[in-house]
Amino acid sequence: MVIICTTPSFVFSVIGAVKRSESKAVIMKHHGAVCMGTSYEDAFAVATALEDVCEKFIIERCCDISGKAVEAFSGVVDYVTDVIKSGDKYRAATEFAPCNSARKGNFLFVGEEGKHAAIIDLKSGAQVGGGEIPDSADLHWAIYKKRDDVNYIRHTKEENVVAMSRKGNTMKPLLDDLAQLCGPKIKTAIFNPNETLKTSKRVAKALGKNNAVLIKDNGAICVAGNEYDAEAVELVMEKGCKTAVGAELYAETKPIGTLDAHLMNFIYKVKYSKKAGK
């Protein structure tokens, strides 16, 4: 685990916790956990066991407050989704199929998983080849037009991400890597396949300078300058949303403070840009 945003007091508190405990793991608020072992394999086994214990803890919490027999984390997602949908303010948005895309020169390649990608001219927005244009092609086009630094877009509809997208709220990070990679706060925007041009601009605006934006009832759009980084943003977004789903089971959970989240994001971008420039 790499912790990018640290302070001397934070480091000393972790060292102190390690010294005071005979445990092989120390949980750090907003920073995951440090897992130790006599070898890489031993430390990895500790990390796996800790993940299992934490997931079981959340599942048991869901059983207690729902009165239902929940056996897997997917049951927690189902319960949280039902609670969100039953709220007075919930208004369902039109759901649509996710697409991934890539910018290659002056062209946009966009398509659903397993289908032949459509090829679109980035300047005009007109199709110049490839397969059928998907419903969300204008959404991808709008982001590329607004963000010169973006070359890859991934649309995840992983169950935890979809659950959090149904809230329709701005999501504040509970984990440091979400603040670092995705943004200090993740907004939600509505995309309507029947009003693509207007709603695509709203999504691009909500994304801003971040690397992720929630799409109401449709998961999240994750962006980056290359394919590897886009996949990393997607993975962190999915993990961050899983954490947020678990947090829905508790009355009071405190996200990372606004100033700290912006600082984490800024330091990550500065360090990453220096690394990329080498």
For the regions a protein language model found, what residue spans apply to each?
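Glycine-rich flexible loops
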Residues: 1-278
